């Protein structure tokens, strides 16, 4: 694994002894660890830290752990979070989990509990990253279609058959079939049903990705997300770990 591929875990806790203890624990499983004493220090890091998982205290000087979680959710940044706290209760735990946290651990907690939660977070991050790469390729393939191919793909996704498409576009059925074959190949679709699934996802990702053909030829491209960049612009125990 290259250094650039190695997961980074951001630990945000205002207690230096806890931060260093967590760094030591996480490094035992060969993880890179970045330490921060506050949310502001994390968001203001230069260069920005883009972690695969965040170990986050609830109570911090300045912005709280919950406030960071809220900001990330609002910016559609889905970095997995493992909350740790010495002052937790059930409502706090429910709040964190409902907002997407991997785990909510009350200090003191067992080392293995934290390691298991961080591993789960990293695996989730990898899975999401893989999905994003796959769909980025789909968007690139769609952008590579001609205007006519985009028109035909839109109509195919709406259940039109070749004869109907030919009549609407004023071309022969043979021409439509040739275009359909080229579209399937370019989009990496194994079948018409697969192409329809891809088209539905494109429309979900961007309402303008498949404009109604009745309003004229499609002339736009799916947008790519820039939320992570927006956030980064604004902006590591052995035994039982207790604050």
Protein language model regions, located:
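Acidic, metal-coordinating helix/loop segments flanking the phosphotransfer/catalytic sites
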Residues: 35-53
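Acidic catalytic/metal-coordinating carboxylates
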Residues: 37-38, 64-67
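C-terminal output helix
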Residues: 89-91, 105, 109-118, 164, ...
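Short amphipathic alpha-helix used as the core "switch/output" element in two-component signaling
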Residues: 44, 66-77, 95
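Recognition helix of helix-turn-helix DNA-binding domains
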Residues: 161-194
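Basic, Lys/Arg-enriched C-terminal extension of HTH/homeodomain DNA-binding domains
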Residues: 184-243
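Active-site residues of response regulator receiver
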Residues: 57, 85
């Amino acid at each position: 694994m290259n250094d650039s591929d190695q997961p980074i875990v951001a630990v945000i806790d205002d207690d230096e002894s806890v931060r260093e203890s967590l760094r030591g624990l996480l490094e035992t499983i060969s993880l890179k660890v970045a330490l921060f004493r506050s949310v502001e220090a994390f968001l203001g890091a230069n260069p920005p830290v883009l972690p695969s998982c965040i170990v986050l205290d609830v109570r911090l000087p300045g912005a709280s752990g919950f406030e960071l979680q809220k900001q990330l959710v609002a910016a559609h940044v889905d970095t997995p979070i493992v909350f740790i706290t010495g002052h937790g209760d059930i409502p706090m735990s429910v709040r964190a989990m409902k907002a997407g946290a991997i785990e909510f651990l009350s200090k003191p907690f067992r080392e293995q509990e934290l390691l298991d939660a961080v591993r789960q977070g990293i695996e989730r991050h990898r899975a999401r990253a893989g999905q994003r790469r796959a769909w980025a390729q789909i968007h690139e393939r769609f952008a590579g279609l001609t205007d006519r191919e985009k028109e035909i793909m839109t109509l195919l996704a709406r259940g039109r058959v070749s004869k109907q498409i030919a009549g609407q576009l004023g071309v022969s059925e043979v021409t439509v079939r040739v275009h359909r074959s080229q579209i399937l190949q370019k989009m990496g679709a194994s079948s018409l049903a697969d192409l329809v699934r891809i088209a539905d996802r494109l429309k979900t990702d961007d309402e303008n990705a498949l404009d109604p053909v009745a309003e004229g030829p499609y002339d736009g491209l799916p947008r790519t997300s820039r939320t992570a960049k927006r956030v980064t612009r604004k902006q590591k125990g052995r035994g039982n770990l207790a604050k």
